[in-house]
Amino acid sequence: MKETKEIRMEKGKPYPLGWTENADGSVNLAAVLERSKECGVLLYPRRGGAPRRLAFREEDRIGKICCMKLIGLDAQEYEYNFYCGEEVITDPKARRICGNEKWGKKISPSLRSDSTEDAFDWKNDRRPQIPYENSIFYQLHVRGFTKHTSSGVTAKGTFAGLAEKIPYLKSLQVTAVELMPVYEFTELEAVKPLRQNAYPAKDQEGNPVEETLPRINYWGFKKGYYFAPKASYSVKDPVLEFKEMVRAFHAEGMEVILQFYFPKEINREMILEVIRYWVCEYHIDGVHLMGEQIPVGILAADPMLTDTKLIYYGFPYEEIYPVGQVPVSYTHLTLPTT
């Protein structure tokens, strides 16, 4: 029987939130968790078996943040979650999400966070940086665009399948694909109880029938795990496959724009961090922002996002850009939808 390695806990740092591997091989874990309950970390061995449970101590709390440093942990051997009382919490900062690889299948028992980071050779990748006024966007749903047999691709419903369609998109003179949400989200949603004014499903006799099957949120415009590409949109490795897709589009002089939906409970700092992450880690060319309380001004003023396309309905460009420095006449920018 293989011995369980000893893991030593020390006081950690509150930022950055999530899982961070330090230069000395230790791992820092930090999360916003309730103060009134016992909270901690669950470590799931990749080879199987019961999770290891490590509780945060009182001295590990700084404000609402719990943090710890783990020494002796082999990061490649574990997936993880946080817990608070009886609730298991998947890390909103996780760079990969495990357990939702099959589209429309029930998640059991819960999603798990994964910190794995693999090196990727971007080769000579360069962002095309096509001016707005010369852009022709093609909006699509990754799964819907390539899932049907008529798409003619091998890897149907995936990032790899979309890359196979580049010649077709180029033939339409498209300069950029705008992808509906590709961050990880749970598409299965609980059935809501029938409301008095709703239009319920009916049987052949016209009698209301209580729905029992979960509904599928096909489009993904909901709160999600914003740092992880959607696993069910890949053949095997969503991180690698998404990067390969972006690199393939760039090689043909085409841009990749992502749609993000942020409900009002997502704070402004988180939104900025998400966009910066995708620009740095995945080399995306722009974002189409949707939701409430989007900090458009902060994003537009961020030096790192100067060359990133920012699309937002009702964009307050006159409040953001100096006179004469607006990047495009927005009255001439159109977004075809297919």
Give, region by region, the residue ranges found by the protein language model.
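The feature marks proteins involved in alpha-glucan
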Residues: 1-24, 51-53, 60-141, 145-157
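Active-site neighborhood of glycoside hydrolase catalytic domains
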Residues: 251-252, 261-319
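Catalytic domains of carbohydrate-active enzymes, especially glycoside hydrolases
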Residues: 165-181
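Structural beta-strand segments of beta-rich domains
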Residues: 25-29
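Conserved, mostly hydrophobic/aromatic
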Residues: 31, 140, 179, 278
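Aromatic- and acidic-residue-enriched carbohydrate-binding clefts of CAZyme catalytic domains
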Residues: 190-251, 264-281
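Conserved small/polar residues in nucleotide/adenosyl-binding loops
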Residues: 331-337
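Short proline/glycine-enriched turn/loop motifs at strand-loop junctions of beta-rich domains
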Residues: 33-38
